[in-house]
Amino acid sequence: MKRLFLSTQYKKDYKKYKNDFKKKEALKEVLKLLKEEKPIPAKFLPHMLHGEYKGCMECHIQGDFLLIWFDKVNDIIELVRLGSHSELFG
């Protein structure tokens, strides 16, 4: 089982959504899959990123609610960012 490392920016991003139950539940589902090293279902549109986030993965937790993570060595996944397209890329 992998461990999750929360970046400082991820923690800040998460605070914006901490009261949104639906988004938090969907996020928990994806985080559980990541920790258990299971594939992210196609409904979340998982894909590799390039540019500023080269080497990271992204998926759509719910609509325009995105998670960016980096699968590090030593069984650690770094949660990099959380938010909308405009918040993350714009």
Where are these regions (language model features)?
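Basic, Lys/Arg-enriched alpha-helical interface segments
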Residues: 1-63, 72-77, 87-90
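Short, charged interaction patches at domain edges and termini
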Residues: 68-70
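Short, solvent-exposed aromatic-acidic interface loops
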Residues: 82-86
